[in-house]
Amino acid sequence: ADVHHGAAVVDAVAPASADAPFIVVAERHRGGPAIVVHARTVVLATGARERFLPFPGWTLPGVVGIGGAQALLKQGAEFTGRRVVIAGTGPLMLPVAASLSGAGARVVLVAEQAPAAAVRDFAMSLIWQPEALAQAALYRLAFLGAPYQLGTWVTEAVGGERVESVTVSSGGRTRRVACDVLCTGYGLVPNVELARLLGCAVADGAVAVSESQETTIPRVFAAGEATGIGGVALSLVEGEIAGAAAAGAIRPDSALARRRASLQRFARALARTFAPRAELRALVRDETIVCRCEDVARRSVMALGDARQAKLYTRAGMGACQGRVCGPALEFLFGWAPGTVRPPAEPARLGTLTVAGLSLAPAGLTPTSNISSGS
């Protein structure tokens, strides 16, 4: 098998007949010719991305994603002595707080928006997941000097040239916390764009799969966070099941199936515990930016009916991120369904699109004919 590192899939097309191959087009990050693969079977493991929810001041320099802060650390960014607030929801905040503390940052507050009772119940359920419980305890010990407050969330970031402080709400009261950096994020969103390009059904924001991890499109399998947020252990088990099924296994291994069921129960508890609270919607003012790429404020989209209208009238979702940041935010704020997915799935060079067009032409397809409008 050929292995291509440093490449991103930009288009994937389902065959017109059962005996025809799938066509997958990828682009190399460092240049070079596009990669075109004809495959009998496709396994999607597209992972997830951070979910950002708008609030006043979230576009200030110094406000970064929780996962983004971790990536900056790995790239050598300097946090020594900087006052950091970490706010949002989910277990990812703990290892990031530990990493920042280890890098010399002063973590002055970790604000978890989930209610205290819900988090306590979730922690008690980890008695059946001793490894996860031990890991969480170790992370907490790593930033023991910083308060970890439940039922607490940032309502505003304040500053001139960059963030200087945040306003936090807790127990019906607000207070100001001085900081140099705000790391924020509200969990993860499954990456389903490639699955939708192939015509796979999506339910509750994740790729729908059978017990063998097969999607609604025959010979296309999916595993990991694309099928729902559940953590590394669940992703690995799903990957084993999907790989075996793609290789011809009729049913998943019974031990793997039991392990998957247990981890899926954990994932459902995770989703219930750390679901963003309704109060976060009320933070967004008329002038608050909801689409950073195109500088679109809430007032410009609040009267519109869906993501398509937002694109037509305001260009929200048409910037560099192609709706990956503002899309989930607008869905949360207004209850909109996900917008239409069109190729390329990732920004691509013209040369790659040309190769894609030549590759799809024999099948009577073009890079722009493969469009999924539903979810």
Write out the residue ranges for each language-model feature.
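FAD-site-proximal beta/loop scaffold in flavoenzymes
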Residues: 64-73, 155, 162, 181-230, ...
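A Rossmann-like FAD-binding core segment of flavoenzymes
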Residues: 4-26, 103-193, 201-203
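Immediate flanking context of iron-sulfur cluster ligation sites
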Residues: 176, 278-287, 304-320
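A conserved FAD-binding loop/helix module that cradles the flavin
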Residues: 223-258
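Local cysteine-cluster metal-coordination motifs and their immediate loop/turn environment
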Residues: 286-301, 314-332
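Active-site-proximal substrate-binding core of FAD-dependent oxidoreductases
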Residues: 214-216, 244-284
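Rossmann-like NAD(P)H-binding beta-loop-alpha module
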Residues: 61, 76-119
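FAD-binding core/adjacent interface of flavoenzyme oxidoreductases
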Residues: 1-83, 167-174, 183-184, 194-196, ...
